[in-house]
């Protein structure tokens, strides 16, 4: 596998994202990278891929170039490998938030949420409680279709369709969280960081985020206490606990996630339809 896939984010105050955009675009193109870099007043969120030499050069650029004023000097990257480029083009986008929650009072760049690392979380889940004896509840902050690909055992899943719904569902389900240690998690850490800050802001105690998200957990401890794969937003569709592309795919017709089991259905036609969008399925639901 010759392509290195990098993902990272960091909350940091950026005064003028528009001034950064042409410089970041130029450097990414010069390095032959493809993917997406999001710039917002609250920070950076990126998914890029390229050769080892060029991704290493990109990491050095982000950490050390004077443009960034040292804001990302300690930026940590999650890495996986693939045999082909997962992205079709290079985009640097300006956004209001690097992950949309529509809660402007939440400012992660002013202070991180408490976090738990993967080995500690595994230890808690092995025992069924944290170091103080409180039961541990895993809270999935991802969208429902992502959760369906895989999640932690017995995780709370409120079936949200977009992250901006998270504050409302938490208010509706506070009773699920009282008296427990809550560990919010997501793919790479960005959503669960905002989620943890929001929960603390509304008075929910003993809240943590999973440091580095599911992918970092896979990297450090494998798939313990996790079932299924982890959905990712590129051609690989999902990664297994060994951080290898799984057999899960997306329907060419409707972009629904199609598990290996669903691919056995006669309604799944590669490159055309799946059980969600096949005409026979639609007719049955309408009946």
Swiss-Prot record:
GO terms for biological process: tRNA modification. Coiled coil: none annotated. The keyword Calcium does not apply. Transmembrane segments: none annotated. Residues 132-226 form the Rhodanese domain. GO terms for molecular function: oxidoreductase activity, acting on paired donors, with incorporation or reduction of molecular oxygen. SUPFAM superfamilies: Acylphosphatase/BLUF domain-like (SSF54975), Rhodanese/Cell cycle control phosphatase (SSF52821). Its EC number is 1.14.-.-. HAMAP family: TrhO (MF_00469). Belongs to the TrhO family. This is tRNA uridine(34) hydroxylase. It comes from Paraburkholderia xenovorans (strain LB400). The lineage of its organism: Bacteria, Pseudomonadati, Pseudomonadota, Betaproteobacteria, Burkholderiales. The gene is trhO.
């Amino acid at each position: 596998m010759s392509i290195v896939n990098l993902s990272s984010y960091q909350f940091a105050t950026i005064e003028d994202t528009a001034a950064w955009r042409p410089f970041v675009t130029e450097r990414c193109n010069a390095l032959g990278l493809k993917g997406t870099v999001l710039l917002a007043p609250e920070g950076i969120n990126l998914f890029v891929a390229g050769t080892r030499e060029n991704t290493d050069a990109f990491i050095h650029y982000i950490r050390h170039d004077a443009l960034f004023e040292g804001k990302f000097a300690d930026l940590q990257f999650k890495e996986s490998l693939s045999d082909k480029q997962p992205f079709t083009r290079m985009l640097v986008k300006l956004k209001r938030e690097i992950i949309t929650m529509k809660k402007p009072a939440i400012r992660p760049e002013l202070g991180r949420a408490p976090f738990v690392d993967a080995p500690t979380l595994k230890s808690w889940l092995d025992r069924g409680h944290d170091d103080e004896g409180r039961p541990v509840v895993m809270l999935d902050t991802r969208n429902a279709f992502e959760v369906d690909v895989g999640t932690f055992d017995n995780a709370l899943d409120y079936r949200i369709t977009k992250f901006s719904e998270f504050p409302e569902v938490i208010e509706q389900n506070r009773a699920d969280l009282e008296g427990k240690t809550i560990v919010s998690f997501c793919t790479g850490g960005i959503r669960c960081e905002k989620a943890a800050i929001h929960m603390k802001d509304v008075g929910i105690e003993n809240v943590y985020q999973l440091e580095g998200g599911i992918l970092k957990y896979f990297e450090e401890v494998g798939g313990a206490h996790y079932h299924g794969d982890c959905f990712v937003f590129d051609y690989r569709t999902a990664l297994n606990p060994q951080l290898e592309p799984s057999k899960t795919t997306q329907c060419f017709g409707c972009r629904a996630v199609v598990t290996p089991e669903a691919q056995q259905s006669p309604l799944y036609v590669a490159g055309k339809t799946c059980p969600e969008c096949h005409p026979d399925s639609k007719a049955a639901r309408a009946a």
